[in-house]
UniProtKB/Swiss-Prot annotation:
It comes from Guizotia abyssinica (Niger). One of the primary rRNA binding proteins, it binds directly to 16S rRNA where it nucleates assembly of the head domain of the 30S subunit. Transmembrane segments: none annotated. GO terms for cellular component: chloroplast; small ribosomal subunit. This is Small ribosomal subunit protein uS7cz/uS7cy. Keywords: Chloroplast, Plastid, Ribonucleoprotein, Ribosomal protein, RNA-binding, rRNA-binding. Pfam families: Ribosomal_S7. Part of the 30S ribosomal subunit. One of its GO terms (biological process) is translation. HAMAP family: Ribosomal_uS7_B. Its main location: plastid.
Amino acid sequence: MSRRGTAEEKTAKSDPIYRNRLVNMLVNRILKHGKKSLAYQIIYRAVKKIQQKTETNPLSVLRQAIHGVTPGIAVKARRVGGSTHQVPIEIGSTQGKALAIRWLLAASRKRPGRNMAFKLSSELVDAAKGSGDAIRKREETHRMAEANRAFAHFR
């Protein structure tokens, strides 16, 4: 048994303009090659575009989109007796938000469009409305978990 203690969970810092942790999590996931200022630019432009499209509070749209995409359950591959089973496991809120952000960014990168800010804003608005690729990904994950419910006792 390990003698090492459990790692302290780091809380995400908030971003300088909106003072929001979700925005900072989004910035850190969109980041490529250490260009954080560019990541901030993309996020802030996307937030402005959301403001123009919906004429509501863009942070509430962001919160609603992430809440809509966050999965409650996922499947994990587990090897039992020579065969690999997809075992459904519950996901905590922090891990769920991280997955949701990852799916939102992947879906927005796939989208056709002018630039990343435009694609991200479109995906966030769609996710807040309950449509889009990220929502489809969450539903697919939930369907997989439901289909493999018989293997839940392998946890």
